[in-house]
Amino acid sequence: IGYPNDVESIVEAAETLLKDDNVHFLFIGSGAKRRWIENSVEQKRLTNVSLLPSRPRDDQGNFLNACDVALVSLVSGMEGISVPSRMYNIMAAGKPIIAITDPQSELALAVEEENMGWVVPPGNADRLVTVIQEARAEPLRLAEMGSRARKAAESKYAYVHVLQSYLSLFEKS
């Protein structure tokens, strides 16, 4: 939960969706923006937001299996600099992704190329709320996106495929 993450849009969306009992936000981890989230949740009385401390990577599957959709966020200007590694774990778990990121980022391109979720521009909490409501209203579409995410994880990002990509890169050198 660091500076590259657009947590502000997520907290704003949580405030808008506060009365929707079917939507809950879970932040796991620590980082530079965690205190800001804690303060915002307390000040705004966001009962639909939970914060947990960092957990062992072995526990990640439990949390991913408990969610319907996962949020991955990056502030503007991160394209070409960062792809959150959690994206690959989310894909492997077969979960659709709501990517809060610039439309030209690697994260956005992967989500759109695989049709495994939605892309929301950073700072656009209203669009995030709309996407969350769409996702909640379409469980079959969520399942299809999750299935595509899992297939992409297996066919493009599994260790054997990544290793082969590196090997072919070195063979060309």
Task: Show which residues each predicted segment covers.
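A conserved mid-protein helix/loop that constitutes part of the nucleotide-sugar donor-binding site
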Residues: 2-16, 35, 89
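A structural motif in glycosyltransferase catalytic domains
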Residues: 6, 10-13, 25, 128, ...
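Nucleotide-sugar-dependent
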Residues: 5, 56-63, 70-91, 96-109, ...
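Nucleotide-activated donor-binding/catalytic signature segment of Leloir-type glycosyltransferases, i.e.
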Residues: 18, 22-29, 34-61
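C-terminal alpha-helical cap of glycosyltransferases
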Residues: 137, 155, 159-173
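A short, well-ordered alpha-helix in the C-terminal region of glycosyltransferases
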Residues: 127, 134, 141-155
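Amphipathic alpha-helical segment in the mid-to-C-terminal domain
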Residues: 57, 125, 142, 155-163
